[in-house]
Amino acid sequence: MNNFSIISEYKPAGDQPKAIDEIIAGLNSKKRSQMLLGITGSGKTFTMANIIARMNRPTLIMAHNKTLAAQIYSEMKLMFPKNAIEYFVSYYDYYQPEAYIARTDTFIEKDSSINEQIDLMRHSATRSLLERRDVIVVSSVSCIYGLGSPNLYYQMTVNLESGKSYPRDKLLSDLVNLQYERNDIGFERGCFRVKGDNIDIFPSHYSDKAWRLSFVGNELEYIHEFDPLTGTKLAKLDKAMVFGNSHFVIPQETVNKAISEIEVELQKRLELLKSQNKILETQRLNQRTQYDLEMLTTTGSCKGIENYSRFLTGRNAGEPPPTLFEYLPKDALLFVDESHVSVPQIRAMYNGDRARKKVLVEHGFRLPSALDNRPLKFEEWEKFRPQTIFVSATPGPFELEETGGLVVELIIRPTGLLDPECIIKPATNQVEDLISEIQTTIAKGLRVLVTTLTKKMAEDLTTYLQELKYKSSYLHSNVHTLERLEILRDLRQGTINILVGINLLREGLDIPECGLVAILDADKEGFLRSEVSLIQTIGRAARNSEGRVILYADKITKSIDKAVSETMRRRQIQQEYNEKHGIIPQTINRTIYALTALKKIDSKLDKKQAHILFDNPAKLKAHIYKLKKAMLKAASNLEFEQATKLRDQLKNLEEAALELS
């Protein structure tokens, strides 16, 4: 069994050693829930990595969005280069679920675009969980959505071993049942080809490796791993395990049984609709379902097959669907990062999904069993989750209730940096005072972050600052992905000194050069000025030893009082620790994770073309397809050097697309 081996130039410092020991003690004493309260810059990810390495148990880390998940995945890959670090998020670049708007009698067909790179990584994640124990899967909250049954997925694997006998026709039939496609011309992921006594398989979990099976009669003589682009042999294998090309691979006998059960439900539903005199709904449901049944009978699949998942996975009505949690070993660990956001997301997903599907069922577009194709209910997630560590700088009520209000704190930063000084000033003439504070901060060579309440305020303030000849820019949801990253890069490099935004809590805004965070209209209670939001925003100034925060308010709200009091409490603890140990706070110049994506974008793309591609998923997909086609053409012409260059460009573009998704 492989053990986790953490590789880092740093050792746990500050509060980290104590926090690691406390969490591990809790895990060993069978505590089901623990709370790790880690402030900005305290090294939460490094602490998680050390806990995982010492416990040596398979781990799932849940994040509340793809960007944060990609950041954690990247950091874990660096710290655990010898272990299986996997990424599991929704594989849709674009997803429009089917829906019916009764008021206008409008039916919206399901439409989606699948990201092949993410699909590959999802397959790699489930394969690792089934094959080994030194696995860390970093996932978004989408891991609570239905996935194929792990029992069927594992049951249908094809195990290959050198020296054993495999009847050729049966092996090819097994590959087709795993939803691999025979393609003797275009050899891509999820395909196989036959050449003489050789069968080449391009596994679903690889992008740059394939397997060549060399037979003598029915005996498998060799298994070689090779580069599918150049044909170069990479390794000789004794064994290989071929997993399905889809997580929804199903044995034919299961499909046949499901068809019978669907027919029974259909007849019951049609009788009910007829009794309610719903003629249109009756005809619609019968026509749509009969078509799906015909497709299932002839091909083993149909469009929207997931709506019949209850029958295909052998579940009873109302039972939870199989999800990634069923792929986890019983002794797995779960970290819920930024739990104050992630937990409410988990709670909300089921209700939103059910409301949409209920309308489809009522109007004859789907059978009632389609309601069981859903994410986990919060109560089900509670039941399935293994020993859990919630991680946040601002724990939510659920986490505090689960842990009895007991938290393990990460307050002392390894760098010695203090929480910023908080100053409260009147909101009257706040812009005039802000200009004065900006001048003082910029004179020190530092940057300024300003948070407003609306997009218009952010844009108007930026325009005003630019009229005063300040190098400033604004950031909000209407700013496209690449432009956003370029603004952050310009801020880091000093091309601009001031960034104005609405919600400065998003990943990527930990700016070490930030000397001032100004919160305008801090006394306007609401989502953007709640205690949690204020603490998180104040944390933006905690990366610099000279960081300050000014809250412009005409009255002290409960949120301001609690946020400032908590910040001052932490600051005092940090000061006392530094004085006791003779530590001088030091600003750490850390690379912003999201900016590394800019370096991976094809250098041949000019700025305008890059913006067009990354702001339009369809055009980006078309460009990636064009590069793939050129790469394969170069390989078929034996121009392997050119093919390799194109493959590197393609890889950089796909990685950048993944990080910017």
Swiss-Prot record:
| UniProt main location, coarse | cytoplasm
| Chain ranges of the UVR domain | 621-656
Q: Which Pfam families match?
A: Helicase_C, ResIII, UVR, UvrB, UvrB_inter
The Gene Ontology terms for molecular function here are: ATP binding; ATP hydrolysis activity; DNA binding; excinuclease ABC activity; helicase activity
Query: Which of UniProt's keywords are assigned here?
Result: ATP-binding, Cytoplasm, DNA damage, DNA excision, DNA repair, Excision nuclease, Helicase, Hydrolase, Nucleotide-binding, SOS response
SMART domains linked to this entry? DEXDc (SM00487), HELICc (SM00490)
Motif annotated as Beta-hairpin, chain positions: 91-114
Q: Where in the cell is it found?
A: Cytoplasm
List the SUPFAM superfamilies hit by this protein, alphabetically. C-terminal UvrC-binding domain of UvrB, P-loop containing nucleoside triphosphate hydrolases
Query: Which NCBIfam families does the record associate with it?
Result: PRK05298.1 (NF003673), uvrb (TIGR00631)
User: Mind telling me which PANTHER family this protein's record contains?
Assistant: UVRABC SYSTEM PROTEIN B (PTHR24029:SF0)
The domain comment in this protein's record states:
The beta-hairpin motif is involved in DNA binding.
User: What is the protein's given name?
Assistant: UvrABC system protein B
